[in-house]
Swiss-Prot record:
ATP binds at residues 30-37, 137, 166, 188. Pathway: Cofactor biosynthesis; NAD(+) biosynthesis; NAD(+) from deamido-NAD(+) (ammonia route): step 1/1. This is NH(3)-dependent NAD(+) synthetase. It is an enzyme of class 6 (ligase). Catalyzes the ATP-dependent amidation of deamido-NAD to form NAD. Uses ammonia as a nitrogen source. It catalyses: deamido-NAD(+) + NH4(+) + ATP = AMP + diphosphate + NAD(+) + H(+). It comes from Mannheimia succiniciproducens (strain KCTC 0769BP / MBEL55E).
């Protein structure tokens, strides 16, 4: 990858999407303290358009993640707001508790997905208020495996990193000046305390990147990649719809 040239391409691509496709005034994104949102923040800052950045911690969010998110905004030259989603989360879980499945294996994923969807609500509400578009942070590895929450962090107006392997996101981050603390940390969606992407998926980003490069990976890695890809087709498509009565000849 010609890193500098691709960074320039993405910056211009973002501006083309914002002005020509959407006709909006700026960008809105959530900054988690991770590499993907850090790269998106730096790209958005370099467009010169207004950027609304939100840090949206939950009760399980570590203070170091918040500190890394703040460092990201400082390095990108962006102002941001810290708004806790914990009160919204607690209220919804309390109100829905009578109808939720209490089986332990469902609980962590359910809670994590709710946090992602609450962040989506915050981002799109802010974006609408400022006539801006929401930047998604999914990279090619996450898109392949469906490692994002449907209608949560998977909901966005544009996905500038969707063509980049995880290794390329890090390469772009180093070029753009993402803080070293962000570059050094293990990727995590922050869905629960101690959670990491690779432990949850059972496959490393290095293995997924190798697969995306067309290289041979271990049988175990291939099995996990196919497992996650096959069970997440619905995340990469619009909801299916039936034929109309005329089309169905009914």
């Amino acid at each position: 990858m010609k890193t500098a040239a691709y960074a320039d391409y993405l910056i211009q691509w973002l501006e083309n999407q914002r002005t020509e496709l959407y006709g909006m005034d700026g960008y809105t994104l959530g900054v988690s303290g991770g590499i993907d949102s850090a790269v998106c923040a730096h790209l958005a800052a370099r467009t010169g358009a207004p950027v609304q950045a939100l840090i949206l911690p939950a009760e399980v969010t570590s203070p170091s993640d918040v500190a890394d998110a703040q460092a990201t905004l400082e390095s990108a030259g962006i102002d941001g707001q810290i708004i806790s989603i914990a009160p919204w989360y607690d209220l919804i879980m309390q109100q829905l508790s009578p109808v939720l499945n209490s089986e332990p294996e469902r609980v962590n994923v359910l809670k994590g997905n709710l946090m992602a969807r609450l962040r989506m609500i915050a981002l799109f509400t802010t974006a609408q208020s400022h006539r801006s578009i929401v930047l998604g942070t999914d990279n090619a590895a996450e898109w392949l495996t469906g490692y994002f929450t449907k209608f949560g962090d998977g909901a966005a107006d544009v996905l500038p990193l969707a063509g980049l392997r995880k290794e390329q996101v890090f390469e772009l981050g180093r070029y753009l000046g993402v803080p070293q603390s962000v570059l050094d940390k293990k990727p995590s969606a922050g869905l629960w305390a101690g959670q990491t992407d690779e432990a949850e998926m059972g496959v490393t980003y290095a293995e997924i990147d190798a697969y995306l490069r067309g290289e041979t990976v271990s049988p175990q890695a291939l099995q996990q990649i196919r497992f996650w890809h096959n069970r997440s087709h619905h995340k990469r498509m619009l909801p299916p719809k039936p034929k109309s009565p005329d089309e169905a000849e009914c």
